[in-house]
């Protein structure tokens, strides 16, 4: 059997269109547009690309967008001071600090300085704690985007055996919480997991986020399983591939996300959703 493709580009476009429609309605009602501030420290090329995509998405949906490109020489105190200013800015509903940060700046201290109601990346301990308690507010963008993909494709997750391959703070751990919330029996695997193949082979739903091209062979995929590939890996040839052997897995899975064009577009679309949510839930008068 050949898997159905989960078209992240199309679904992300739908999500952005829904956000844009809501913004237009807000403006028609005499309310302000939501505002997003993006902070980048240094000149990392990949970060520049990501920040650019977020700015374009803001323009598309009608948000107020502010970008702060700080030099490598910026110290932690200066960055925290900017966050404090944005926390107090009534026009800004979401604050995003682009990672990675230069050496000498404490990621945790910076992310925890963002007010939880403006934490549109969903990384603040308060928001992660809410997700853990099954009462989420602002949810991490990539995991929330994956849940949206599953919902929009009509994939019923209740009772599924789900295996999360990767345990990062950005994807793996919050994704496992999202899968629990979606009714899955959830296993998290990581670099010290023994018999990874056995875990993957029994999974009804596989989410892979390890950053290693072709890490999950196609033959490990149980016939009929759903495969969500978060990996974005550029080969020496320039080709971009995921963490799962797509060709092999697509012959066995029922649904699969391509790379590129699967999970990636949903991360930015979900950021737009989170910013709108922050505006309407926490900052409207």
Swiss-Prot record:
Catalyzed reaction equations: (6R)-5,10-methylene-5,6,7,8-tetrahydrofolate + NADP(+) = (6R)-5,10-methenyltetrahydrofolate + NADPH; (6R)-5,10-methenyltetrahydrofolate + H2O = (6R)-10-formyltetrahydrofolate + H(+)
The entry's keywords: Amino-acid biosynthesis, Histidine biosynthesis, Hydrolase, Methionine biosynthesis, Multifunctional enzyme, NADP, One-carbon metabolism, Oxidoreductase, Purine biosynthesis
Transcription regulation keyword on record: no
GO cellular component, one term: cytosol
Domain of life: Bacteria
Annotated InterPro entries: Aminoacid_DH-like_N_sf, NAD(P)-bd_dom_sf, THF_DH/CycHdrlase, THF_DH/CycHdrlase_cat_dom, THF_DH/CycHdrlase_CS, THF_DH/CycHdrlase_NAD-bd_dom
Pathway where this protein functions: One-carbon metabolism; tetrahydrofolate interconversion
UniProt entry tagged with the keyword Transport: no
Gene Ontology molecular function, alphabetical: methenyltetrahydrofolate cyclohydrolase activity; methylenetetrahydrofolate dehydrogenase (NADP+) activity
Gene3D superfamilies (alphabetical): Leucine Dehydrogenase, chain A, domain 1, NAD(P)-binding Rossmann-like Domain
EC number: 1.5.1.5, 3.5.4.9
Residues reported to bind NADP(+): 166-168, 191, 232
GO BP terms in the entry: L-histidine biosynthetic process; methionine biosynthetic process; purine nucleotide biosynthetic process; tetrahydrofolate interconversion
Similarity comment: Belongs to the tetrahydrofolate dehydrogenase/cyclohydrolase family.
Physiological role: Catalyzes the oxidation of 5,10-methylenetetrahydrofolate to 5,10-methenyltetrahydrofolate and then the hydrolysis of 5,10-methenyltetrahydrofolate to 10-formyltetrahydrofolate.
Assembly notes: Homodimer.
NCBIfam families: PRK10792.1, PRK14186.1
Protein name (record): Bifunctional protein FolD
Name of the coding gene: folD
